[in-house]
Amino acid sequence: GLPVCGESCFGGSCYTPGCSCTWPICTRD
């Protein structure tokens, strides 16, 4: 949904619940 999760995912994973990796940043669903 919302574009920003406040997390980067250079390693390929997001640790914030409800977020997915759109490299290199995490995006919310």
From Swiss-Prot:
The keyword Plastid belongs to this UniProt entry's keyword annotation: no
The keyword Translocase is annotated on this UniProt entry: no
Organism in which the protein naturally occurs: Oldenlandia affinis
Family: Belongs to the cyclotide family. Moebius subfamily.
Function: Probably participates in a plant defense mechanism.
UniProt comment concerning the protein's domains: The presence of a 'disulfide through disulfide knot' structurally defines this protein as a knottin.
Keywords attached to this entry: Disulfide bond, Knottin, Plant defense
Cross-link (Cyclopeptide (Gly-Asp)): 1-29
Superkingdom, natural source: Eukaryota
Post-translational modification: This is a cyclic peptide.
Disulfide bonds: 5-19, 9-21, 14-26
A Gene Ontology BP annotation from the UniProt entry: defense response
The protein's name in its UniProt record: Kalata-B15
InterPro entries assigned: Cyclotide, Cyclotide_moebius_CS, Cyclotide_sf
